[in-house]
């Protein structure tokens, strides 16, 4: 680890293989908290490359639990966090909308680290069980079209690193890495990031990790989700080709709204917002979910345009299918209680 830290301190990039070796040392039982902290801070100061991100993500996936699924026709939608927007859980809400529209969503997430409420926190508040087995996850993906993969259970080797991250209280490479380490083999991904300068880097990383299609976006006002507040920046990865474009909500039939209109709160408050959206309540919360779900459906290739994706997302909510996907997961908890 000393050689790696020296190289990073001198602002030298690591090759893919060097990062893989550094990752193996990072996940070793004898690594110290100070070594982890030094690695995270040095890498953040230098700036992450696609090779470094892919190298670390590949080892995290290598040491993750195995999910016994067949095929690769799965999508994940998530943000990196770290944008400081204090918004509600947009991607978690949108995940149920995607499933209601026919996508198979392997929703990979965690408790809050650098934000107020993580996806695991809000789902737990809704009564969705987090401690499901890998076999149950595979079954849920097949029968319900959506399953939640609790990152702490998927990546047991990262427990010590999570502790250091919480102590640091700043965004690190693991904000970027988390969304890249889904143990389910994904065909498509929608990934929102808090740093516009990393759009192409993350898209190249996804290509290196085998994604066929993906969209990486940076929202208006610095959000890690597509925003109604103004123009959003996106990069489409399509079979290895990168296409950058911008998107304003009015271009796809949605009204502009400030980020203050989608503020979240505690896990319980965000759970209530999620339910209001899935039950059909109109307003900026719903429109933000429609925008993000519509982009994800376009990324997947399920629709030809983002506007069409928004229409399909609205149908998913208004038909009740999105809410049914959540209720299916909630019933698992009830069945556990009954025994």
Curated annotation (Swiss-Prot):
Binds 2 magnesium ions per monomer. Anthranilate 1 binds at residues 79, 110. Its EC number is 2.4.2.18. 5-phospho-alpha-D-ribose 1-diphosphate binds at residues 79, 82-83, 87, 89-92, 107-115, 119. Belongs to the anthranilate phosphoribosyltransferase family. Pathway: Amino-acid biosynthesis; L-tryptophan biosynthesis; L-tryptophan from chorismate: step 2/5. InterPro entries: Anthranilate_Pribosyl_Tfrase, Glycosyl_Trfase_fam3, Glycosyl_Trfase_fam3_N_dom, Glycosyl_Trfase_fam3_N_dom_sf, Nuc_phospho_transferase. GO terms for biological process: L-tryptophan biosynthetic process. It holds the Pfam family Glycos_transf_3. Anthranilate 2 binds at residue 165. Catalyzes the transfer of the phosphoribosyl group of 5-phosphorylribose-1-pyrophosphate (PRPP) to anthranilate to yield N-(5'-phosphoribosyl)-anthranilate (PRA). It comes from the Bacteria. Homodimer. One of its GO terms (cellular component) is cytosol. Mg(2+) 2 binds at residues 224-225. This is Anthranilate phosphoribosyltransferase. It comes from Exiguobacterium sibiricum (strain DSM 17290 / CCUG 55495 / CIP 109462 / JCM 13490 / 255-15). One of its GO terms (molecular function) is magnesium ion binding.
